[in-house]
Amino acid sequence: MSTKPPTHILSIHGGMTFKTQKDYLNFLKNCQIKLNKPKKWQDEYLTNELGPKFEIIRPTMPLKENAKYADWKIYFENYLPLLNQKFILIGNSLGGIFLAKYLSENRLPKKAVSVYLVCPPFDGSLSDEDLVGGFKLKKDLSLIEQNAKNVYLMFSQDDDVVPVAHAEKYRQKLKTAKIIIYKSKNGHFKVSKFPEIVKMIKGDLV
């Protein structure tokens, strides 16, 4: 008896963009290096909680600390032909607006089961970061909802990077997407566990 292939999850991490090379070099000069990195919900936790019915693919996107949309688009498209018939897309932070932009401007070869945009910025009105590098969204985002059976956007009221007001901006552009606002996800979803998304992903296949 043949076994069903796993549902692929293509998970796009966050990143940063800078207006100038000088700003980027200044960031590199002053960034704090941590040898012991905190555990993130999208890493081993997600793999362990979802189990063998899912296979998580985590591309290392080009130059994540000085990201350019055009670079990410090329690299992302290399993965699309490799995905199984059933697949889910997750974008975290900059990865979220990357998916929002890509899916609003391009039709996928095959429809995703679900798309999860976790704390995605909508525009450049951020607390202390620039949003440049070609990630600006166009006015019409309707194609996002045509590219997936389910679209979820997740925000936190205590997010200190992407203000929760960005949830309403997306709400005005999307008709059927489910927008979820949590009271607290330790700021910019800096949590080691995320049981809500695990339950939702498992529910996508029911």
Give, region by region, the residue ranges found by the protein language model.
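Short alpha-helix in the alpha/beta-hydrolase fold that links the catalytic acid
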Residues: 163-172
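Active-site nucleophile loop of the alpha/beta-hydrolase fold
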Residues: 14-15, 61, 115-125
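Conserved hydrolase catalytic core segment
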Residues: 101-114, 123
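Gly/Ala-rich beta-loop-alpha elbow adjacent to hydrolase catalytic centers
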Residues: 90-99
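Short, surface-exposed "cap/lid" segments of acyl-processing enzymes
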Residues: 2-53
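Catalytic histidine-centered segment of alpha/beta-hydrolase-like enzymes
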Residues: 185-196
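Short beta-strand/loop motif that positions the catalytic acidic residue
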Residues: 147, 152-155, 159
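Acidic catalytic loop of the alpha/beta-hydrolase fold
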Residues: 124, 157-162, 187
